[in-house]
């Protein structure tokens, strides 16, 4: 696991704890979505690499966010930006948002699974995979289907950090690894 992901998870967990304590998860989700969207802008990212002091960088970022959404950013949200700028972590905002969203889905007993296949799956095939995963995870499952011709055949299922690889490409790779050892 990369160190950036670990750091982003730490921020996401801290923000999630505040959101649960304040009973305002949706508000924080929309704030982090805004911060993430703004931080993905090329011009804003170029600010992150300039030699600006953290307070100045935070103020500029917050001003951009306020201008974008046409309303003030609250004090708690500003403090998150100040802390992340102080530690040179503003580039992690999209990852923090993704991890926060994952924590929210766990909190409401819903999990998103990514189903990757070589060809588009039919509705009944997706439903069968979704039902099996919902039973296995004991949660409501939101499937996201993607097509990747490189896997040759079969299905890959991703649930957070867990990967279930039932693809031909994965089997060939594992067979090759066994034969070489």
Swiss-Prot record:
It comes from the Bacteria. InterPro entries: ATP_synth_OSCP/delta_N_sf (IPR026015), ATPase_OSCP/dsu (IPR000711). It is found in: Cell inner membrane. GO terms for molecular function: proton-transporting ATP synthase activity, rotational mechanism. Keywords: ATP synthesis, Cell inner membrane, Cell membrane, CF(1), Hydrogen ion transport, Ion transport, Membrane, Transport. GO terms for cellular component: plasma membrane; proton-transporting ATP synthase complex. Its main location: membrane. It holds the Pfam family OSCP. F-type ATPases have 2 components, F(1) - the catalytic core - and F(0) - the membrane proton channel. F(1) has five subunits: alpha(3), beta(3), gamma(1), delta(1), epsilon(1). F(0) has three main subunits: a(1), b(2) and c(10-14). The alpha and beta chains form an alternating ring which encloses part of the gamma chain. F(1) is attached to F(0) by a central stalk formed by the gamma and epsilon chains, while a peripheral stalk is formed by the delta and b chains. F(1)F(0) ATP synthase produces ATP from ADP in the presence of a proton or sodium gradient. F-type ATPases consist of two structural domains, F(1) containing the extramembraneous catalytic core and F(0) containing the membrane proton channel, linked together by a central stalk and a peripheral stalk. During catalysis, ATP synthesis in the catalytic domain of F(1) is coupled via a rotary mechanism of the central stalk subunits to proton translocation. This protein is part of the stalk that links CF(0) to CF(1). It either transmits conformational changes from CF(0) to CF(1) or is implicated in proton conduction. This is ATP synthase subunit delta. It comes from Blochmanniella pennsylvanica (strain BPEN).
